[in-house]
Amino acid sequence: HFNWVQMAGAIKHPDKGKKLDISADTGKLVNIDDASVFLYPVDGYGDENIIRQIMAIEKPDAIMLVTDPRYFTWLFNMEAEIRKEIPIAYLNIWDDYPAPSYNKPYYEACDLLMGISKQTVNINKIVLGDKGKNKVFKYVPHGLNPDIYFPIDESKDKGYRDFKKLIFKEEDPEFVVYFNSRNIRRKQIPDTLIAFRLFLDSLPEDKRKGCKILLHTELTSNAGTDLDAVREYFFEENYEDNVIFSLNKLSQQQLNYLYNLADVQVLITSNEGWGLTLTEAMLAGTPIIANVTGGMQDQMRFVDNEGKWYTPDINVPSNHNGTYKKHGEWAFPVYPASRSVQGSPPTPYIYDDRCRFEDVAERFKEVYDLDPKERKSRGLKGREWVLSEEAGFYSQRQAERVMEG
């Protein structure tokens, strides 16, 4: 294992200027006797001076970056200075094609490019072209702790039963759709709600009340919309009790409760690098409904014509057109019905894959029509695959992949 030194960023970090030793706590967490883990608190994402200070004091063997490269333009501007001493490794993700040539200077500045999604690995290679010959490319998908997100036996967990009563009051819903993400436009929450409304309309009247959609998100956001107004317009007249919002900050244990309350997790984001809530749901043994875009494709385990887990390449860079239809039993994919090009000055172009809410409603009905035992069986197969050697979407395997890189 590695010794670890990290810039610990916050908007205005209260411990800026200190050096924090969390070696003992980390050692207990991962059962290592000689852990060495230090934090250098910084405002924002740091600057040139803190990097030079850390390099002089700690003498690291490499620098590893995570997140959008534009947060580290100052570091990439000093890449020649850094790479005289040590290599730069970048754990990166990109939501969609076209391959972003505007990221080329950032990718060129790295020695190791670790793509969180298979699509990102392909994008890194496309953007670099011949300049990637001396680079190392590695698939390093997200990894979570399977001891935090796991299936719960309701009969043996009073805390879970009490939490369920808190959410549903005196009701015991027959079918629960769960959404967990930020209230921002690309998450397509209004489309998700309209799809649920159409699903309710398709049911016999006596079955509608027992179906709920539970959303753990912000009720109102300038980056998204007023979800209570959406609920009122589409549900108030006939379905005022079918939409439930979870608005409080929750512990990881409570989040796991929510995943276990659900019969299916939904995420139809139009641009999604990975979709961590899908991974969390799968670890909890819950099936998923997802838009076929970005890293969500990895989690649905599409199978190519050779019977292998689909890997994007120059011929089939994405499965958003439905080239491959076979997938994991835990997944209920929704193929995009439209594609547009969006952008901003820093990121001038990127595809925006949008699915029809009518298609999402059909996936709700497909999951609803399954026997509850079949739904659970499929969800547990998802957890089994997440923890398999092939997928390895758990924290220990992610760490091993980083070290292999």
Residue ranges of model-derived segments:
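A charged, aromatic-enriched C-terminal amphipathic alpha-helix characteristic of glycosyltransferases
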Residues: 351-359, 372-404
